[in-house]
């Protein structure tokens, strides 16, 4: 089934000039880029995006990290895009990352793991709508 999912290239990766390399890797692995933008999130935007995590121990450090440098948001499309992109991203925990995954290749640590991806089709729809209007997705 053809799906769309949201990808974020996080501040640790944009700061190290890895945007092109990561986007190319996504495309080489069967994910088409249907929308793309670079932005510097505000605290309010970040808190809104991660609202489901408000009150958790990692919330404030996550917000601070995500506003520290620009990010890139992209709509990816492909066969089972949500699941396939999550497999391509790799595990959040550094010790569980497998060779060939974006986080193994480019992640620096637990939070500084280069990329974000929607965890379900429902999340993908919500997250895509958070950053893109329908007319921005081709």
Curated annotation (Swiss-Prot):
Q: Which residues form the active site?
A: 116
Reaction(s) catalyzed by this protein?
a 2'-deoxyribonucleoside 5'-diphosphate + ATP = a 2'-deoxyribonucleoside 5'-triphosphate + ADP; a ribonucleoside 5'-diphosphate + ATP = a ribonucleoside 5'-triphosphate + ADP
**Which keywords fit this entry according to its UniProt record?**
ATP-binding, Cytoplasm, Kinase, Magnesium, Metal-binding, Nucleotide metabolism, Nucleotide-binding, Phosphoprotein, Transferase
User: Which Gene3D superfamilies does its entry note?
Assistant: Nucleoside diphosphate kinase-like domain
What Enzyme Commission number(s) does the record list for this chain?
2.7.4.6
The record's Gene Ontology cellular component field reads:
cytoplasm
Where does the UniProt annotation locate this protein?
Answer: Cytoplasm
Q: Does the keyword Chaperone apply?
A: no
Subunit composition and interactions:
Homotetramer.
User: What is the name attached to this protein's record?
Assistant: Nucleoside diphosphate kinase
- What is the organism of origin for this protein? Glaesserella parasuis serovar 5 (strain SH0165) (Haemophilus parasuis)
């Amino acid at each position: 089934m053809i799906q769309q999912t949201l990808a974020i290239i996080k501040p640790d990766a944009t700061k190290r000039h890895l945007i092109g390399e990561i986007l190319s890797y996504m495309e080489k692995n069967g994910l088409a880029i249907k929308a793309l933008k670079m932005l510097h999130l505000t605290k309010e935007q970040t808190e809104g995006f991660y609202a489901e995590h408000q009150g958790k121990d990692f919330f404030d450090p996550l917000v601070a990290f995500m506003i520290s440098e620009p990010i890139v948001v992209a709509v990816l499309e492909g066969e089972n895009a949500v699941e396939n992109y999550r497999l391509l991203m790799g595990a959040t925990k550094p010790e569980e990352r497998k060779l060939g995954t974006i986080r193994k290749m480019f992640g620096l640590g637990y939070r500084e793991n280069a990329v974000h991806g929607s965890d379900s089709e429902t999340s993908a729809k919500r997250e895509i709508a958070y950053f893109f209007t329908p007319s921005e997705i081709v």
